[in-house]
Amino acid sequence: MRIGITCYPVYGGSGVVATELGRALATRGHEIHFIAYSLPFRLSKVTENIYFHEVSVNRYPLFDFPPYALSLTSKMVDVAKYEALDLLHVHYAIPHATSAVLARDILEKESRSLPVVTTLHGTDITIVGQDASYSPVVNYSINASDGVTAVSNFLRQETYDAFDIEVPIKVIPNFIDTEHFRRLEKEHFRSAICAPGQKVVVHVSNFRRVKNVSHVVEVFHRILQEGISAKLLLVGDGPDRSNVEQLTRDLGIQRAVRFLGKQDPVQEILSIADLFLLTSGSESFGLAPLEAMACGVPVVCSDVGGLPELVEGSEAGFLCPLGDIQAFAKACIKVLTNDSLHAEMAQHAREYAVRHYDTHSIVAQYEEYYEEIIGRTAAQNPKIIVPE
C-alpha cells in the first residue's frame, strides 16, 4: 500500500506513535509518505520506502495567523494525487482530520479515492477537542472520516461521551519495538549517575500541568524521608520545569534530583531505573510507562484514563488514586524495599509488554484495518478511481 501519514512532528506521544508506525509499515514493504510542517523528530533520516513532504505556510499581511490547516489540505491533495496514495492516516484530530476530510472531498470532485483514517490520541478529545472553539469541527471531522481508531478503551468511551459520534471507533493500542526497548547493560552509566546501593526513580514527560510533575517530586521527598537512598531522574522538558526545579530547592532535595531534559531514545536511562513513577492527571494510554515496562522496570501510576488498561493484569506495578501523595509514596517504598517483589514485577513488566504491545502484532492490526477501510470505500464509491 501507499500510505500518507500526518502527525505533529514534535516531542510527544502521538508523533512518536505515528512515526514508529510509518517506519514499521515501511519495513513491511509499504510506501510511506509523511506530510507535516517539519521532519518528525524520531524520523532522523528518510530511508527506503519512506518519503517526507514538507508543508509550507506562506505569510500574508492580511492574515494575523497563518492558515496552516488550509496549506496542509493542499499538500495532502498534491501528495495523494501525484504519489497515488491508497489511504491517508492522520494522527490527532485537530486540525489533521479536518484537513484530511477536506482533501478527500476535493479529490472526490476529480473522481479520485482517498480513504481517511483518523487516530485519536488523547488531548485532541479530552481537552483541546472539547473547547467550544473547536468542538463542532472535531465532531464533524470524526464522523466524516472513513475509519476512526482510538489508542485505548478509555479514550474510545470518552469520545462517545463528549461528542455526538455516529461512526464505530476501533481500539488499536499504542505499541513499541520491544527489541529496541529492552534492558541494556549500563552499569557504567549507573555508577556515573548515583552512588553504589542507591535506588533510581525515573519520570518521563513533557512537563505540562496535566503531568503533575510536582507530585512526582513530593512523592520522592517522602521516599527520602523514609531513609531510602535514591536519585530521581526527570526526563523531558516543558512549561512546568522551572516550577518543579524550584520545588526541589524548597524541599531541600535538589542534589538528589537530576533534570536530564529531552532524551531520545530513553532506554539507556530506563535500563538503570529501579522504578518508573507517573502521577498524571490524565493519560489516554501511557506510552512512557509501557517503554519502562519493556525495559523491565516496575511502574507506579495514577489510576486514571487508559493507565489501568496497561497496568491492571500485568503484575508489573501499582495504581494509586490521583493526587494521593501518601499512597504513591507507600507503593514506591514497597517496590524499592522488597527485592523479591521488585524482581517479580520487573519480569512481569517485560513479559507483558512483549506479549501485548509489540510492534509486529499491533502494526498487523493497522494493516488489516487499512484493507477493510479501502475495500469498504471502493464498494461505496464504485465510480471513484482507485490508485493502482
Please annotate each region the language model reported.
Residues 154, 175:
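Carbohydrate-associated surface elements
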Residues 195-211, 217-220:
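Conserved donor-binding/catalytic core segment of Leloir-type glycosyltransferases
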Residues 182-195, 341:
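A short helix/loop element that forms part of the nucleotide-sugar donor recognition site in Leloir-type
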Residues 327, 334, 341-356, 362-368:
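A short, well-ordered alpha-helix in the C-terminal region of glycosyltransferases
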Residues 298-301, 311:
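Short hydrophobic beta-strand element within catalytic cores of glycosyltransferases
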Residues 7-11, 23-68, 169:
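N-terminal strand-loop element at the rim of the active site
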Residues 313-314, 318-325, 334-339:
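Conserved acidic donor-binding segment of nucleotide-sugar-dependent glycosyltransferases
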Residues 262, 281:
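Aromatic "clamp/platform" in nucleotide-sugar-dependent glycosyltransferases that forms part
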